[in-house]
């Protein structure tokens, strides 16, 4: 719902008093089947209680959900040049800066579907460039999807069908604390509660294996290479599956006999899944590791069923990529400077552009966590952020906005890219959605 005070009436931001979705304040309330926006899995089975002290996760919590839902908001008001102003004035100043800019950069993009659609509309109107703060990790996937294609599974298919799960070079438990609980070792499956136990293989040493336990898990195997060598180990696995001889008797400490044993497990699997998380693959040319993971899937589909599953997707990055794709035809790093969408994954990477002095205004959206700080830059910055967002210096314009799924309703695209999940308004604070603020800025241009 559009906040009527955005363009004129005085604002009071934020109020942490409990309220209903309509804005009417109420006593404590308990919410069932709450979707969590604080990681890409968007677990939608939480129970959250709201009282006059704030929110508390009562059921199906993890560290990320507790930190996100139960965070106390500091006082925050709209600012222009570091001084408190009414919201309408901040919006008018933001519109003025965008109207004067020759090449505005729209970054951060931690928002929901509606917020991202508003970003795309404003970027098109102002001739700007769109890129998510975490797109460097996303492009480890995009480059392979664009050049060779892939075969992927979903969270539900993996949960219900997989008998072999290979975790490739990625600390999945750190990124998704409930992945093993919900997907790898759930209490039952959709098709057969007496399904045989599944084998879990970790390729990489130092990965958190503590959650790889439960009644659904049989053998847990580790091939202890450096995580950045996981692609090379999988490449050797592909070679052995194809019948090639390898001269080295080991790959980064992984014995060829262990690779051969994994090859035999892959041959016998009825439904295998290779899991990786691009944020974990933080080394040069990591897309080549992703190419090996997806190539293994293609090879094995000649004789059995195998699929990939890419994880990650924090800060609404999956949503940003999805909305950008269906709105412009391109997955982020899109320029509207010519009046039409233009795509270049190098030229329009906002991180590179800021480092090299390109662009004359940064519009930064960070509505989910307080950790997605705008990068240091000499150009004016407009920030639409959750209260408590870490800022190195006062931006030209600061507008506090709500978190989707906490302060207002919304939608986020899940990490497997097959569904957008509805987010509830839990009434934590009376903060406007980023989508409403962006629409008001566009209306004021």
Each model region followed by its residue ranges:
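Short helix-loop-beta junction
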Residues: 122-129, 295-303
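Short connector loops at secondary-structure junctions
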Residues: 128-148, 207, 305-332
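Non-catalytic alpha/beta scaffold blocks inside enzyme catalytic domains
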Residues: 142-301, 335-445
């Amino acid at each position: 719902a559009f906040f009527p005070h955005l363009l004129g009436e005085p604002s009071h931001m934020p109020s942490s008093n409990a309220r209903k979705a309509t804005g009417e304040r109420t006593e404590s309330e308990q919410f069932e089947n709450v979707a969590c926006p604080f990681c890409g899995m968007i677990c939608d089975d939480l129970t959250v209680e709201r009282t006059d002290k704030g929110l508390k996760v009562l059921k199906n919590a993890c560290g990320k959900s507790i930190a996100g839902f139960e965070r106390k908001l500091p006082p925050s008001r709209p600012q222009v040049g570091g001084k408190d102003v009414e919201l309408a004035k901040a919006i008018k100043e933001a519109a003025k800066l965008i109207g004067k800019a020759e090449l505005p950069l729209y970054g951060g993009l931690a928002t929901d579907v509606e917020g991202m659609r508003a970003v795309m509309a404003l970027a098109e109107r102002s001739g700007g460039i769109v890129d998510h703060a975490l797109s460097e990790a996303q492009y480890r996937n995009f480059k392979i999807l664009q050049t060779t294609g892939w075969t992927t599974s979903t969270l539900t298919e993996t949960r219900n069908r997989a008998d072999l799960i290979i975790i490739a070079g990625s600390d999945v438990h750190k990124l998704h604390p409930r992945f093993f609980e919900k997907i790898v070792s759930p209490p039952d499956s959709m098709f057969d509660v007496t399904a045989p136990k599944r084998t879990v293989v970790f390729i990489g040493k130092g990965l958190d294996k503590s959650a790889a336990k439960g009644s659904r898990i049989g053998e847990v195997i580790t091939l202890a290479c450096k995580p950045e060598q996981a692609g090379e180990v999988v490449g050797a696995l592909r070679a052995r599956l194809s019948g090639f001889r390898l001269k080295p008797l080991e790959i980064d400490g992984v014995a060829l006999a262990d690779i051969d044993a994994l090859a035999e497990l892959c041959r016998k699997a009825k439904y295998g899944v290779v899991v990786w998380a691009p944020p974990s693959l933080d080394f040069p040319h990591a897309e080549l590791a992703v190419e090996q993971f997806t190539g293994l899937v293609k090879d094995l589909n000649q004789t059995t069923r195998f699929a990939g599953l890419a994880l990650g997707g924090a800060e609404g990055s999956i949503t940003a990529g999805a909305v950008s794709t269906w709105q412009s035809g391109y997955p982020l790093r899109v320029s509207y400077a010519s009046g039409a969408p233009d795509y270049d994954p190098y030229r329009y990477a906002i991180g590179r552009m800021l480092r090299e002095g390109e662009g004359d205004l940064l519009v930064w959206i960070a509505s989910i966590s307080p950790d997605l700080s705008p990068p240091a830059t000499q150009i004016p910055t407009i920030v639409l952020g959750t209260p408590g967002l870490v800022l190195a210096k006062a931006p030209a314009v600061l507008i506090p906005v709500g978190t989707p799924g906490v302060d207002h309703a919304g939608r986020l695209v899940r990490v497997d890219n097959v569904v957008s999940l509805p987010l509830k308004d839990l009434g934590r604070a009376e903060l406007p959605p980023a989508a409403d603020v962006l629409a008001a800025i566009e209306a004021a241009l």
